Curated annotation (Swiss-Prot):
The CFEM domain is involved in heme-binding and contains 8 cysteines and is found in proteins from several pathogenic fungi, including both human and plant pathogens. The CFEM domain adopts a novel helical-basket fold that consists of six alpha-helices, and is uniquely stabilized by four disulfide bonds formed by its 8 signature cysteines. This is Effector CFEM6. SMART domains: CFEM. Belongs to the RBT5 family. Residues 248-271 form a propeptide. The gene is CFEM6.
Length: 271
């Protein structure tokens, strides 16, 4: 038992030493595959368990080919073979990339949008962040590995620049007169969209408009009153002669009647 522990410790130290000699892309592939131990039903650093699943070796092979290129992938694949051989598990065929006749596994990289907390980079804010997941498919088995992420940034709301600004005009019509007044404005920003912002003088503009309308109405009312008064005066002036004439006519009729009566009486006396 003691011998086994010493051997395991020596193997772990050797593996660490060899891993550091690999290119950065290869170290990432090995680290990612080792981190998938729970996916393979293994505990961390259980080489025998990991290497017993051929998908572990396929993952190292395909990841190194995709990340490092075919030429630089050789040392990474060799590391995987040595790693499993030291644990007593031999690898051969397509897992090592030596025998393509067995059919290579298929590596698929997909991006999946994930929620963003709105963190900003300088004056930019994150719009969406996507994870890049590598799926290694061999037969009916699929192994997924998150190999990175990408974030799309856009200008923060506070740093948006206005594209165009248009006034909001209110028009009040009184009779044949119209009173246009700017009561606000609407601004289209590059990111924030359409933001409607009332002007600070909107209230005073409306008050001024109301006063103007009231003043115009007062002038119209005063003019109308003056016109009515003038018309009444003219009618009164015109009515007085008529009344006098009527009165005079009545008087004339009365005078004529009296003359006729006197003439009739005079005629009666003669008769």
């Amino acid at each position: 038992m003691k011998y086994s522990m010493i051997t395991l410790g020596a193997f772990a130290m050797m593996a660490v030493a060899q891993l550091s000699s690999l290119p950065a892309c290869g170290q990432t592939c090995i680290s990612n595959m080792l981190a998938l131990a729970p996916t393979f039903g293994c505990t961390a650093n259980d080489a025998s368990c990991l290497c017993s699943d051929v998908n572990f070796a396929y993952g190292i092979r395909d990841c190194s080919n995709a990340a490092c290129g075919a030429e630089a992938a050789g040392p990474v694949i060799a590391y995987g073979v040595e790693y499993c051989s030291s644990a007593g598990v031999g690898l051969s065929g397509s897992a090592t990339g030596i025998d393509p006749g067995l059919g290579p596994a298929t590596a698929v990289v997909a991006s999946t949008p994930i929620a963003t907390d709105g963190a900003s980079a300088g004056s930019l804010s994150a719009i969406t962040t996507s994870e890049f997941t590598s799926y290694v498919i061999s037969g009916d088995s699929t192994v997924s590995t998150i190999v990175g992420s990408t974030t799309i940034y856009g200008p923060a709301a506070g740093s948006s620049s206005a594209i165009t600004t248009s006034p909001i005009v209110s028009t009040v019509t009184s009779g044949d007169t119209s009173y246009p007044t700017t009561v606000g404005s609407t601004t289209i920003f590059g990111v924030a969209g359409v933001i409607s912002t009332p002007t600070a003088s909107a209230s005073s503009a409306l008050d001024s408009l109301s006063s103007s309308i009231a003043s115009e109405a007062s002038v119209i009312t005063s003019s109308a009153s003056a016109a009515v008064s003038s018309l009444s005066s003219r009618l009164s002036s015109a009515a007085s002669p008529v009344s006098t004439t009527t009165s005079s006519a009545g008087g004339a009729r009365q005078t004529a009647f009296a003359g006729l009566a006197a003439a009739a009486g005079f005629a009666a006396i003669i008769l």
